[in-house]
Design a protein with these regions (language model features):
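Acidic (Asp/Glu-rich) sequence patches and key acidic residues
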Residues: 1-295
Length: 295
């Protein structure tokens, strides 16, 4: 079974954390920790994005019965609506709900509804990371619009000062920004709406997002990063390759010396005849793409 986390660490990405203490059990002590299934029931039509349920190794009964205290974090959202979703974890007798900065308007509305229902279920106050208190009656009035504006301004500033590309993580796919994209968002009549649409559309693309593969990791040689491009399948590749956050630990701090694209294909009626047809330098492949194939 494969799990993923969508938010990058605090030193690389800002986020808001809201804390809700666990309810006391009747007669004293803490009530049982919610399972994944119970946590998802707090908001209608909420789905998990930790695991691929189409994976033949996915154990639905085992996963949904898992207590949040046994899971590093539950990534949740509304399929088709969420851009970045929210993360729920349990530690030190409390539920922590994390929302990335910036997140989409739909993400925030779902997260605030989640916090409201969590507060009702736990019959207690919600506390933000800066100590501000909220109740189930007023949490939905949290000013998330200013948080979206601040997050977009931070991306813009990073691109202007040092970064060639800024990347955030969505419920399904990464979202990258360069100066052209962030300028289009910031110049829109409603930047938060433009950002929300951009991020959510990328999560709902009917395309294969190419996975990264690496060679030379366990050898005393250069590390080569590779993207797989299948024949006859709509595939999304980054304009400029960089190591996905989920792969940083695999590399153990080592740098990728070069990137390539491996074109994979063969006879669709005979899977055993599929093979790598060609391997190209990444920059050469991108430079030779027709202009209508990328923005």
């Amino acid at each position: 079974m494969h799990f993923r986390l969508n938010f990058i660490p605090e030193d690389q990405n800002e986020h808001h954390v809201f804390r809700q203490k666990q309810k006391e059990a009747f007669g004293g002590g803490e009530a049982p920790v919610m399972s994944v299934e119970e946590a998802l029931r707090l908001v209608p039509n909420l789905s998990q994005f930790n695991a691929d349920e189409d994976d033949e190794e996915f154990d639905a009964e085992g996963f949904y019965s898992t207590k949040l205290s046994e899971l590093s974090c539950l990534t949740a959202g509304a399929d088709g609506l969420s851009g970045r979703g929210l993360e729920v974890c349990y530690e030190d007798g409390a539920y922590n709900v994390c929302i990335g900065t910036p997140s989409t308007r739909a993400d925030w509305r779902i997260a605030l509804e989640y916090l409201k229902n969590l507060a009702l279920k736990m019959d207690g106050e919600i506390t933000s990371e800066d100590g501000e208190k909220f109740s189930a009656q007023n949490i939905e009035g949290f000013d998330f619009e200013s948080d979206i504006r601040a997050g977009l301004a931070n991306i813009k500033r990073n691109l202007e000062e040092k970064a060639v590309m800024c990347t955030i993580y969505g419920v399904r796919n990464e979202v990258s920004f360069d100066q052209k994209i962030i300028a289009r968002i910031m110049d829109a009549p409603d930047p938060a709406d433009e950002f929300s649409k951009f991020v959510t559309d990328i999560q709902n693309l009917n395309a294969y997002f190419s996975d990264q593969m690496f060679s030379g990791i366990n050898e005393d040689s250069e590390i080569i990063g590779r993207y797989i491009l299948p024949q006859d399948i709509a595939t999304v590749l980054p304009f400029e390759p960089s190591v996905d956050y989920n792969n940083l630990q695999i590399l153990g701090g080592k740098e990728v010396s070069r990137w390539s694209v491996a074109i994979f294909g063969g006879d669709e009626d005979h899977c055993e005849k599929y093979d790598i047809l060609a391997t190209l330098k990444y920059e050469n492949f991108i430079q030779n793409l027709p202009k209508d194939k990328y923005e």
